[in-house]
Design a protein with these regions (language model features):
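Short glycine/proline- and charge-enriched loop/turn segments
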Residues: 61-65, 143-144
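Short glycine/proline-rich, acidic loop/turn segments that cap or connect secondary-structure elements
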Residues: 54-57, 339-345, 386-387
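Conserved N-terminal glycine-rich FAD pyrophosphate-binding loop of Rossmann-like flavoproteins
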Residues: 39-63, 199-215
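Active-site-proximal substrate-binding core of FAD-dependent oxidoreductases
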Residues: 198-203, 375-402
Length: 431
């Protein structure tokens, strides 16, 4: 590609965000290429084990009539791949192509790649995700006597049968691993966490309970954020009381500006009394035991790390970007939701979906406005935001800066039409 003319746009990452941005770039008539280091598209969802599932309803994951047959990893991956086949994206995708370095030379983005030589583009979408590097905390003492596994690497949960398991973490992945440990008959389960995150206690399956629609309706009606918080807090308090989970309530009140509320796990909730819970960190793994910072010691066969992911932007030549390790940190370095303040013509769509929202639909809304900005029909400013925007609030923000894409429709009218007019059992329409 060294002899090719400068492109309008390069996209790094072939997960759901990258493919959606590729579709909207092609629809806008831009000269574009998508670079994916893996042998095939799918991003993190290609790497996850088959038992992993989404934290929201399937109708909130997909968009329009793109098919999704269920919430599990193979079904989610098939949905991601359907973007390629439905919209004929393959000609502009380069798989097995790692970006070794991305730098701006004052005029264009220059990408040094592993298989395509040097790619130049006026604009760059970094769609490598905000959670793309599994992370486990340091442990002062390890002697190898205890097996360790990150949630993303647990391929066969059946291997937990009869084992003494320690689950570490207080978020959604921890609840998943507790559920898997119970379903596959671990002999003993210890749960250690520094802090807990809010979840929705429920007996329903995640794929049913994880709907974004209740909050979306509040947003569509123009309910102020603090009143949204009050209503959701009251609902959660009633649910925690009903399930007898007051001991698991986080210390900090829920704030929809910062928190993602994910569904509880019915199996874990039903068997909570069987789980040995501790607030603390792992300080040592030796002699077949786990020592926690609360002073307790536990005989353990396997540690399951539900400690999440870090952001890896090490491919950027800009040291400030390369040093970023988290989505909140990256979001603070952006204006207008996802425009980089460190480099020109650089977009991080992943920060726009940190919280709650309808995944593909929100990415599509962002992608459409980015392409309008590149084409000159929208003006996405560089104004930093005081807080993250989610779902329909994100739509309102972009509609005011990209009226052409929204057909000149009043942003509030558009949000009411979509948020109140879309049946709960149907995906949002394709933007």
């Amino acid at each position: 590609m060294n002899t090719h003319p400068t492109l309008d746009l390069a996209i790094i990452g072939g997960g759901i965000a990258g493919l959606i941005h590729l579709h909207y770039a092609r629809r806008a008539g831009l000269r574009v290429v998508l670079l994916e280091r893996a042998p095939a598209v799918g991003g993190l969802w290609r790497e996850l084990p088959p038992w992993q599932d989404i934290q929201i309803c399937t109708v909130d994951w997909t968009v329009g009539d793109l098919p999704i047959d269920g919430p599990l990893q193979p079904q989610v991956l098939a949905n991601i791949e359907s973007w390629v086949s439905r919209f004929g994206l393959a000609p502009d995708i380069r798989t097995g192509c790692a970006v070794k370095q991305a730098r701006h030379d004052g005029q264009t983005w220059v990408l040094d790649t592993s298989t395509e030589g040097t790619v130049r583009a006026r604009h760059l979408v970094a769609a490598t995700g905000g959670h793309n590097k599994p992370w486990t905390p340091p442990v002062a003492t390890r002697d190898g006597s205890v097996a360790e596994c990150h949630s993303s690497a647990l391929r066969e949960p059946s291997e937990l049968a009869g084992r003494r398991v320690l689950v570490v973490g207080g978020g959604a992945s921890a609840l998943d691993l507790l559920d898997q440990s119970l379903l596959h008959h671990a002999a003993h389960i210890v749960w250690a966490y520094r802090s807990l995150r809010w979840f929705t206690p429920t007996n329903k399956r995640k794929a049913v309970a994880g709907s974004v629609r209740p909050v979306a309706r509040l947003q569509a009606q123009g309910v102020p954020l603090e009143r949204q918080n009050e209503q959701v807090r009251a609902d959660l308090a009633a649910r925690y009381h009903h399930f007898g989970l007051q001991a698991l309530q986080p210390e900090r009140p829920l704030d929809l500006a910062a928190d993602q509320v994910f569904p509880g796990r019915a199996t874990m909730l039903a068997a909570l009394a069987q789980i040995d819970r501790h607030r603390g960190e792992v300080v040592a793994l030796q002699n077949g035991q786990a020592a926690l910072s609360d002073g307790s010691t536990h005989a353990i066969d396997t540690v399951l790390w539900a400690t999440g992911y870090r952001t890896d932007l090490g491919y950027f030549a800009n040291p400030a970007l390369a040093a970023v390790t988290g989505v909140n940190e990256l979001s603070a370095r952006c204006g207008c939701i996802f425009r980089s303040l460190d480099e020109p013509d650089l977009y991080f769509p992943g920060v726009g979906l940190e919280g709650f929202g309808a995944t593909s639909w929100n990415f599509a809304i962002m992608a459409r406005s980015i392409m309008s900005h590149i084409a000159g029909t929208a003006h996405l400013d560089l104004e930093p935001l005081p807080r993250r925007l989610h779902h329909l609030d994100l739509v309102r923000h972009l509609a005011a800066r990209d009226p052409v894409s929204f057909g000149g429709q009043d942003p509030d009218d558009y949000c009411r039409e979509v948020g109140l007019g879309t049946p709960d059992d149907q995906p949002y329409p394709m933007p």
